[in-house]
């Protein structure tokens, strides 16, 4: 049954419905939970289990009877491990990290007539700034940073012909929840968080496909692919790579109700179209044997 995705159920459905890939040459299915474990391993390798983001930024030029100045804000947030939630049919992932500790302070700095905030060049505890007291972030209000990050493909991370699917935080849309910095709008704070992630090249790899022609069988060499995310009747969230090899990209999506037999202990599956199996794998094997 669909609510008990066993290997037997999957094989019976594929036998009954025949061409279940709906025109795709191959489909890789991976459980969201398995990808999450992979992401957590990457997080540990990148951060040793602790991640701190810190920014110093300047506001616009202001005037007073004593001269021109700007407001300078600095913050430091220590983040907990990320949680990742894939969004069906949109190829985006929602990433949330709790702010487990942090501090902020603000001050003023004298500026001249040509001052530009983007090039103020301030550093943490900059001696040019008249600083106010350090204030701790109220972690009792459960502050978090949330990012909506697109799944994208980049080449060359592993070798020149490898296409790697990544979460690239430089393109993310960020929201900071339950944190208020004096004189700083929520949009300004979100922009500073995004700037930190872009500057620090924070990415997570999902999977890689090698487009080289090293395979003895061209029908098994990817030429194009696209993403798909589904939630099955049993509640499993599955990330799919819909792969084109020697055929043409299909317009639809696979019609397999439960592509991963989780009740039989599986966390992923690779499906190859019957066209390739019979025409390019079995026939090639028979011809080679003959």
Regions of interest found by a model, annotated:
Residues 2-195, 199-290:
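Hydrophobic membrane/lipid-contacting segments
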